[in-house]
């Protein structure tokens, strides 16, 4: 259910701005998006797993807050990230 270390490293390398960048908004949103996809697949199979559902809601909320921050501070970067991750914007 959790992201494997290799997959997380791959996502970080794809979205980081430099070698030391592991915590920028871009990286955090990309990692959260992948975790949300995994949790969604899990919840389709396990409909009564309410603890995982709560975790999903938490991750979606955190990603929403990060995207709102990015939208307010750098609109072009926000649009690029949304299109690259294939997310809908609000």
Swiss-Prot record:
InterPro entries: Ribosomal_uS15, Ribosomal_uS15_bac-type, uS15_NS1_RNA-bd_sf. The keyword Phosphoprotein does not apply. GO terms for biological process: translation. GO terms for cellular component: cytosolic small ribosomal subunit. One of its GO terms (molecular function) is structural constituent of ribosome. HAMAP family: Ribosomal_uS15_B. Part of the 30S ribosomal subunit. Forms a bridge to the 50S subunit in the 70S ribosome, contacting the 23S rRNA. Belongs to the universal ribosomal protein uS15 family. One of the primary rRNA binding proteins, it binds directly to 16S rRNA where it helps nucleate assembly of the platform of the 30S subunit by binding and bridging several RNA helices of the 16S rRNA. This is Small ribosomal subunit protein uS15. It comes from Mycoplasmoides gallisepticum (strain R(low / passage 15 / clone 2)). The gene is rpsO.
């Amino acid at each position: 259910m959790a992201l494997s270390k290799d997959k997380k490293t791959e996502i970080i390398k794809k979205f980081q701005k430099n070698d030391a960048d592991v915590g920028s908004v871009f990286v955090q949103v990309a990692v959260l998006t992948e975790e949300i996809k995994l949790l969604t697949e899990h919840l389709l199979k396990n409909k009564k797993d309410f603890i995982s559902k709560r975790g999903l809601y938490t991750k979606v909320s955190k990603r929403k807050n990060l995207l709102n921050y990015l939208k307010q501070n750098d609109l072009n970067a926000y649009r690029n990230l949304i299109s690259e991750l294939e997310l809908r914007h609000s």
